[in-house]
């Protein structure tokens, strides 16, 4: 089973973006994106979006996919169908954090995002 981390596990304290990732053989495929949240403070949320580009320089004006806001540790998966977007060669993760605690502390999340072709787990189990 081939897994591509779009964002390796990281601790983040501010909004940010991950590196540009070349989709390679996964261009134009149906992908399962998994967001793993391993660390979180109370009273904060994390929003993760996936952006696409044909060349790694010029990025779409809207995200290709968006995870709903998350408030707890766990694994969350969504589908990214690139079947109609064969022009997308690169993807990049962006994240936004918010905190509504009365404390002055900054938000903090430990998280990662990886992508695998839909059906990859089934193929491995059958083999």
Show the residue positions of the predicted features.
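Exposed aromatic-hydrophobic patches
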Residues: 19-23, 73-83
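N-terminal "first-domain core" detector
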Residues: 1-41
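Tryptophan-centered short beta-strand motifs
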Residues: 17-20, 56-62
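C-terminal interaction-tip segments
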Residues: 1-3, 10-11, 27, 98-127
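Solvent-exposed serine/threonine-rich low-complexity stretches and specific carbohydrate-binding patches
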Residues: 7-10, 61-71
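Noncatalytic modules at the cell exterior or secretory-pathway interfaces
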Residues: 28-35, 84-109
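Short coil-to-beta strand junction motifs in C2/discoidin
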Residues: 41-48
């Amino acid at each position: 089973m081939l897994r591509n981390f779009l964002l390796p596990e990281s601790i983040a304290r501010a909004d940010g973006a991950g590196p540009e990732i070349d989709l390679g053989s996964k261009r134009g495929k149906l992908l399962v994106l998994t967001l793993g949240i391993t660390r979180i403070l109370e009273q904060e949320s994390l929003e993760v979006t996936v952006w696409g580009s044909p060349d790694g320089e010029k990025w779409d004006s809207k995200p290709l996919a968006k995870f709903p806001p998350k408030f707890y540790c766990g694994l969350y998966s969504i589908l990214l169908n690139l079947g109609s977007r064969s022009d997308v060669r690169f993807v990049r993760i962006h994240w936004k954090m918010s905190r509504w605690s009365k404390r002055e502390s900054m938000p903090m999340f430990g998280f990662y995002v990886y992508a695998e072709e839909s059906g990859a787990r089934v193929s491995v189990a059958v083999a």
